[in-house]
């Protein structure tokens, strides 16, 4: 121890120097100071926490708190001398807080650089409430405004730039409100800058750009948040973006002065006008404007690219890593939770809903079309330089956020057990950056269902439901769309869909049974024929028309225009077939009259019941509801009428189709009964039933089920729904009464109101959406009927879709609906894949004759029809080709005879005939197309055979159809085009037909009971153009020829073939292609021949519109060619007939042929696209051509009560409006389109001869159309066509006496050519010169002139001419009779000049058809001599160069060789220079007709011989060239040979060659050959 002390002493014995000691102390002190700094900060934090906890109640406490807040934000503060003013300052701004002596806040002012202090209400409110936290945030915001590296000068410029941007955005918001008077919610969702909240204090300007439905509900109370101008909108509500300026590494030229000039918008959307950027109003700054998100939002790669494209500034660098978009959405949604915690979800989420438990699997890695998964990134801000970029950026962000909202609705923190009972599994997979699918098990069937949601923008989501063809209906696309747009929640929507399906199932107990039956039938592959119908339906379903409300609206419009026609043309046949074939449906609908008492009832029964029914669609007529649905309203009211329409849409087999089908849904019902009835006529009960089931299965059990269930069981409301949708048909008034009287069930259904309520109850939600539905006709088969109504039947639907698509897209589409890419793809697939909903599958299953499918005209027609009907591509149509034939099978009983493609009626070359029939003669297929083919290739056979059969059996219908199936086109055209002329002159025939129509239809049903007919009925709808009501009927008219054996009890001026032009179809088909009408008229005509009705009904409306007619032609009719679904079908018929006749391709495509197609026909021989692609042509077709055809139809219409009145008015329009349209279509087109009817008629007449009847009917129709067109087009085209046509038919079919009588009655305007006269003379002649007017006024050539013509026609008919009064029918009857039958009984129906209801003046036994044909020819010759030619010529010249040579020739060429052949031949025969005679005007025509009559008589003799020869030749070439009928129109069609042939033979042969060759090689060939 001592040693230790010693050492210590020695060590410290020396004293340290003082300086060293001081240094040591300082070191220690410095260390201590350093240590104290942390402690000091800690102490400061503690003091601040204490201050926050203390209550500020004094002046000193308030000032202390303010100083503390300033320090926290790096700002300086000081007090005024009196201590009541506190200043918080920086270099760029300062705050002035005014206090009273008690420490109470008086005011808070903010002063930015060089600005005067401005009071800030928000800061005042926050300080008064002692909300110092928010006050502090304001200070931070103010500091951030100037957070830019640089000096004060740069910061000042940046502030000026931000200020100018804010001023511009504020002005944009004001201008938008001024222009739209938008509500707060509308501003948020649609405003150019959203809902703008100006910068206040430290809070920058914010733009509220999106609010989801759930954002508007108060989580606490569950009450809805009210957004109104008077109340402040919470900043936190919905999605917001802040407007700021921030420093960047790049230099940008930013405006420092406001750029908006003026205070008014440049448009109704609130778009302002900006001044250009100059050096005076802008500066280059190392900064940029930004839209900043409170939290980064998930944005897909595609949207990032769109935004970058908009702003021109990259958002991310090239090395940025993208992540699966669904994963980002999941993170974003889960981060919204107040207590976000880790959740082991594996992209599987659960939702517990009332009564349902859902499990959602988000397939984040699902490959997109490009093979990559949907990827995105989190975006926090978007740079931009100009205020005009803000609206575009917000629109894109809204779109993305809407998509994210739907996907995010599946993301829940709810946890359920995997084995939870009743747990429903759903898979959500992306299809694109804005589209995704939700797959789940069908609520009823053991199959997979898929709902595709396409987020088109922030407020429009298009939904489509895809299910199996035989799956029970679930709900409509529109219903789904409505639900989604209301809630923007997938779980809620899935629950609604399931509940709706349960409701429907509960309401339709028979659905399951029906579904099973249908499935069995499908498995057995029973009636492929029905597949065509379904094919169309499928096509529809394949089509994608958005069902979203917006889409729905468009579709509805489309449907209103085009769907009506479509419904008429396509829907009826298919639906009818289904109904009639299905005993359950039949019993439900009590379809006894039309179907012949029962589905299995004898064809004669239907014929007897016809008086009440009065048309082939008598079934429908019996069913007032069905009639209504099948008639005009189908298009108009369908979507609007039936809010429940969605339900029907639900029935659609393919959701994609469902949209359009919605509108169609309501009407298809009636159509379906109609179709069934007609088919029933042709087929045996078992066959029909099988076909019905098969069709239903093909198109979709749902529709079928619904239809059946609705009508038969407790779901009358469902079926009625379809009916309801179609209840409003105006054109079908007459039919409706018949339907009512005939159908009790229908009466029930007719009680649209009663049904609607039921449907509404069943589909209350759907009903609401139904109005929006564009027409989901996806499940065409069953609901397809309803859909069909909307879309005009299964085919109609498809047509409708196509049309809609075209309309909308030319809409549609229809609903629109479309418009919908996915559905379209589906359609394409469907036509490409037999499994698809589209008709393809069915088509493939149908036993079509390869020739039929491949036949030029048939396949062309099929394609046309498909094109019209469906949006799907040519493949779809091609698939339809078979179906079309199948539809035609109505004519040839495709399904029945399946592979044969044979015309049951015994068409010459069955296979060929069938194809021809299907293309040329089958109304079902597309009257004109079928008819045209028939009239071309098969016409001779059909004409002769059919004509003969017809007198014997249902042939009458076919004859009436246009010389049988062959004359179908002609008939259709003639009925449609000639329909008007027929209406008057043909009215006898028409009326007889109208009245006989039901019989015919029954006949057709008994005769054309073949499933194929039924099945083909769907195609009939397209064909239906002629007979709007019952496409099937129309097709049937063709089908009956194929099937027809039983003679029709009543022949409306229906000289077996002459009947081709059916007054009834005319009545409906006045607008729609007359030919179709004709053809359909006698048979399919339910007061509106299936085709004629559809087109004519449509056209009527169109016609009445005049220009409107054109629109329909081009839009409604133009969709397809005009006439929406039916019109399109009819147009197709007509146009096809025309186009086909005129141009083989057209005929083939039939599409070309919509009267509107006329131009397509000529212009686009292949027509399908032509029609679609030639709206102008469509237009012409609709107005003039359709008008004309309508005229023919009108004649027929006249017999049909609805038609007479409506057709006349529309006819009145026809010549003019129609003509104008034709004209607009192009004189040439008029010829072609007008030719739709003309060509159809003439073409048919000449080409196929479409059995003289067809030919003449066609001629008449053509003439009528031509006349109408001519008058509109300058009278040249029409006259040319009319004359040409008129002459041909006149010569062909109308006896000289008839021609003379017609001339006398019609005057020169009559155009002298009996049959053709109505169109040609009455319509044609009248149309040509003044006649054009006469024609218009007279039911577009038939009405005004027809009365006279009709009376004379009746006389003529009684003479056997059968052509006089009902020029078309007569002619057709006469000529056709001649060509196809030896003799026949014709009922002469005379319509009043004013277009009053027609009366049957007498029943006449047609004298030798050949004579009739010759007579018609003579008359046609007269016509040729008549002014029609001159009128026609100018028109043709006007319309197309091809017509320049000579009106007659030109029209011929334009008209398709058919018209060229028939008309041209006639012209050539009579008037070698068509234009020279045309110039003659009415008087000239009359004189010409007189002289021509003599000449005709002489030529009749020759023609008879030639016709016989030609018939033989045709029979030979018939089978050989269904497609190349053009080579030998005469050969192809005896009738043609008779009407056109004899004309051709009489020196027309050579002449036609030039023009024909010019326009249609094939058609040209025919005349040349002749």
Swiss-Prot record:
Tell me, how does this one assemble? Component of the Mediator complex.
Q: Does the UniProt entry include the keyword Nucleus? A: yes
Name its cellular compartments: Nucleus
**Where primarily located?**
nucleus
Motif LXXLL motif 1: where in chain: 585-589
Q: Which Pfam families match?
A: Med1
Write down what this protein is called: Mediator of RNA polymerase II transcription subunit 1
Task: Write down any Gene Ontology CC term.
Answer: mediator complex
By sequence similarity, the record places it as follows:
Belongs to the Mediator complex subunit 1 family.
Q: Which domain of life is it from?
A: Eukaryota
**Is Cell wall biogenesis/degradation among this UniProt entry's keywords?**
no
Q: Where is the composition biased (Gly residues)?
A: 961-970, 1217-1228, 1308-1328
For this chain's UniProt record, which GO biological process terms are given? cellular response to thyroid hormone stimulus; positive regulation of transcription by RNA polymerase II; regulation of transcription by RNA polymerase II
> Which intervals of this chain are the motif LXXLL motif 2?
626-630
Region annotation (Disordered) ranges: 592-687, 771-880, 922-1561
One annotated GO molecular function: nuclear retinoic acid receptor binding
> Biased composition, Polar residues: where in the chain?
788-801, 832-861, 931-942, 1173-1190, 1276-1287, 1418-1433, 1441-1455
Compositionally biased intervals (Basic and acidic residues): 675-687, 946-958, 1347-1359, 1504-1516
- Keywords linked to the UniProt accession: Activator, Nucleus, Transcription, Transcription regulation
Q: What does this protein do?
A: Component of the Mediator complex, a coactivator involved in the regulated transcription of nearly all RNA polymerase II-dependent genes. Mediator functions as a bridge to convey information from gene-specific regulatory proteins to the basal RNA polymerase II transcription machinery. Mediator is recruited to promoters by direct interactions with regulatory proteins and serves as a scaffold for the assembly of a functional preinitiation complex with RNA polymerase II and the general transcription factors.
Q: Where is the composition biased (Basic residues)?
A: 1494-1503
